[in-house]
C-alpha cells in the first residue's frame, strides 16, 4: 500500500491484516498466559511500546508514563528481574498492561527475542525507546580496555541491535527514540568514551529518520542532562551532586519523570513532525 492510496482502501487493508494477525497469534497469547485485556492490543485497539533498560531510572519512568498514556508496555532488564517485575506490577495496579523480559541488548539474539515477546503479548509494536546503557568514567590515560569495550558493546552495538529490530518491527506511524546525553555538549573530563557512545545515538536517529521515509515513523534522539538516577549519582558525594545541581538554572537535578514527560510528548500525536532531531532536555545547563 502506497502513501497516496485511497484512505478507505488503506484502512480496509489494514483492518484485514490486523484481523489475520490477531487470529494467528491467539494460540500464542493463550500459551503465554496473556490476559484477555492484553490480547485486546493485538486487534489494533491499543498502542504498544517497548522500552529497553526500564527496570529503574529513566527507563522505568518512561515505561510507567507511556502506560498512563494508554500504551501496553514491554519492560526490559538485564539483571534486575525483581525491579522489572515491580514496574510491571505498578503499571497493572494502575490499570495498565505490561510484560517484562530479561535481555542483554548487546546480544542480537536476545534483542530479537525481546521483540518476539512483545509481538506475542501485544500483537506488534508502535514505539521503541532505546534506553539501555552503562557508564564507565576515567581519563583517557587510565580507561581500561574492558570498561571501554563493554560500554561500546552496550551503548553503541546494543542500541544498534535495538534500532535494527525497531526498523523491522515498528508499525507505520510509530516512534523510535534513542537515548543520547547532554554530556555530548558538556564534554566534561573523564566522560570522553561515554560521550562518544552517546553521540552515536544522535547519528543513528538522524540517519534512520531518512531511511524510514514514507512510513510516517518519527525517529529522534533524546539527550537528558543531569538526572537523579543511580547512573549519575553513584560514586559521587552529596556535595558533588549538589554542586552539579547548582550548575543548572533551575538549581536542581532532573527527575526521571521530567525526561519521561518529554518522551511522552514525542510519542503522542503532537510529536509526529519532530523527526531526525536531537532533543535536549537538560534544564538549560547547556
Give a label for each model feature:
Residues 1-14, 132:
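N-terminal secretory signal peptides
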Residues 163, 197:
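Active-site helix of classical SDR
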Residues 71-86:
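Conserved glycine-rich Rossmann-like NAD(P)H-binding loop of the short-chain dehydrogenase/reductase
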Residues 168-169, 210-211, 272:
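Alpha-helical segment proximal to the catalytic Tyr-Lys
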Residues 213, 218, 274-276:
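Short, small/polar-rich loop/turn modules that mediate ligand/substrate recognition or access, typified
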Residues 55-56:
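Conserved glycine-rich cofactor-binding loop
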Residues 139-140, 144-149, 240, 244:
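Substrate-binding pocket helix/loop in short-chain dehydrogenase/reductase
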Amino acid at each position: 500500500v502506497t502513501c497516496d492510496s485511497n484512505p478507505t482502501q488503506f484502512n480496509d487493508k489494514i483492518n484485514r491484516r490486523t484481523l489475520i494477525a490477531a487470529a494467528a497469534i491467539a494460540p500464542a497469547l493463550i500459551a503465554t498466559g496473556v490476559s484477555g485485556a492484553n490480547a485486546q492490543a493485538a486487534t489494533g485497539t491499543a498502542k504498544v511500546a517497548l522500552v529497553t533498560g526500564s527496570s529503574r531510572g529513566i527507563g522505568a519512568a518512561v515505561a510507567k508514563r507511556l502506560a498512563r498514556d494508554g500504551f501496553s508496555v514491554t519492560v526490559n532488564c538485564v539483571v534486575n528481574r525483581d525491579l522489572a517485575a515491580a514496574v510491571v506490577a505498578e503499571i497493572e495496579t494502575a490499570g495498565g498492561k505490561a510484560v517484562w523480559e530479561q535481555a542483554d541488548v548487546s546480544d542480537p539474539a536476545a534483542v530479537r527475542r525481546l521483540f518476539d515477546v512483545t509481538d506475542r503479548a501485544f500483537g506488534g509494536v508502535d514505539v521503541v525507546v532505546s534506553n539501555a546503557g552503562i557508564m564507565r568514567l576515567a581519563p583517557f590515560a587510565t580507561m581500561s580496555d574492558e570498561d571501554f569495550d563493554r560500554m561500546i558493546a552496550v551503548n553503541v552495538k546494543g542500541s544498534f541491535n535495538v534500532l535494527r529490530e525497531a526498523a523491522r518491527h515498528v508499525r507505520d506511524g510509530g516512534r523510535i527514540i534513542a537515548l543520547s546525553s547532554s554530556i555530548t555538549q558538556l564534554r566534561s573530563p573523564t566522560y570522553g568514551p561515554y560521550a562518544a557512545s552517546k553521540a552515536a545515538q544522535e547519528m543513528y536517529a538522524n540517519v534512520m529518520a531518512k531511511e524510514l521515509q514514507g512510513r510516517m515513523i518519527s525517529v529522534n534522539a533524546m539527550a537528558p542532562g543531569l538526572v537523579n538516577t543511580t547512573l549519575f549519582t553513584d560514586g559521587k558525594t552529596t556535595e558533588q551532586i549538589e554542586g552539579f545541581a547548582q550548575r543548572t538554572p533551575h538549581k536542581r537535578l532532573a527527575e526521571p519523570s521530567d525526561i519521561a514527560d518529554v518522551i511522552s510528548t514525542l510519542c503522542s500525536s503532537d510529536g509526529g513532525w519532530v523527526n531526525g532531531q536531537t532533543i535536549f532536555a537538560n534544564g538549560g545547563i547547556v
